[in-house]
């Protein structure tokens, strides 16, 4: 995206422009529920609303870092097919993206960069080389991560802490046993930024692995609305 061209749209009447994608040259990147209070209306003219996966991961990682001190880690996304993908093989600048949408594809993702833009204290801790599994489903994504944390904790205490610290508007915890575990379609039109699967949360000494469910379209749109309503006041 050419930010210089976007800035040409600014005028006396149009004082701020919000972009629904990651844009490193934007004046400010916001994930609602993480850093919207740092927005300065007269200074931040071009505002990026990050990405759907950034909005899913950042609120959770903010709490984990504040409570348990993230040392380093990796993030991976499991993401449905995009509209740009075709049902049959065809040309594409990335060969794997040119393959039919019924395939499982491994591609690079900017989720780590999106997180670091709003949580700069995680720079150098979350690996920038993140990967995405593009899978042949229509809706609902998952963020999988492995983190090394400084403060050791049991799984039960970790879940209790996350549940206590989270804002229920942005985050949720899916409790239950193996027999009650939910699947992706159960989260369609769930407005929360992400929902932690307690059953799929594991802790081994100082290593934490987790799964976050999120409706990558509906929940992201709700956060876009929240952010614009808050920042345009």
Show which residues each predicted segment covers.
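N-terminal Rossmann-like NAD(P) cofactor-binding subdomain of oxidoreductases
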Residues: 1-87, 91-93, 97, 202, ...
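Short pre-catalytic strand/loop immediately N-terminal to key active-site residues, enriched for Gly-Thr
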Residues: 44-48, 207-212
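Hydrophobic alpha-helical scaffolding
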Residues: 50-51, 104-106, 214
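A generic structural signal for alpha-helix starts
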Residues: 55, 151-153, 218-219
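C-terminal substrate-binding/catalytic lobe of Rossmann-fold NAD(P)-dependent oxidoreductases
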Residues: 72, 77-208
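Mobile acidic interaction elements
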Residues: 128, 215-217, 230
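Glycine-rich phosphate/pyrophosphate-binding beta-alpha loops
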Residues: 134-136, 213-220
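Short, hydrophobic alpha-helical segments
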Residues: 149, 228-233
């Amino acid at each position: 995206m050419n930010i210089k061209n976007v800035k040409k749209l600014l005028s006396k009447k149009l004082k701020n422009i919000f972009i629904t994608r990651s844009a490193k040259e934007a004046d400010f990147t916001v994930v609602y529920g993480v850093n919207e209070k740092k927005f300065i209306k007269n200074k931040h003219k071009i505002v990026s609303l990050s990405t759907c996966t950034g909005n899913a991961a950042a609120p959770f990682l903010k709490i984990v870092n504040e409570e348990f001190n993230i040392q380093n880690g990796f993030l991976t996304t499991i993401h449905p097919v995009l509209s740009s993908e075709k049902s049959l093989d065809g040309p594409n600048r990335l060969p794997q993206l040119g393959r039919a949408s019924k395939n499982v594809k491994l591609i690079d993702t900017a989720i780590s960069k999106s997180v670091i833009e709003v949580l700069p204290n995680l720079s150098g801790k979350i690996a920038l080389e993140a990967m995405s599994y593009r899978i042949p489903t229509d809706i609902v994504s998952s963020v999988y991560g492995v983190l090394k944390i400084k403060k050791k904790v049991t799984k039960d205490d970790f879940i209790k802490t996350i549940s206590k610290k989270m804002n229920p508007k942005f985050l949720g915890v899916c409790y239950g046993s193996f027999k009650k575990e939910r699947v992706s379609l159960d989260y369609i039109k769930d407005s929360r930024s992400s929902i932690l699967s307690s059953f799929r949360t594991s802790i081994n000494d100082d290593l934490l692995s987790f799964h976050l469910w999120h409706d990558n379209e509906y929940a992201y749109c709700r956060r876009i609305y929240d952010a614009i309503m808050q920042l345009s006041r």
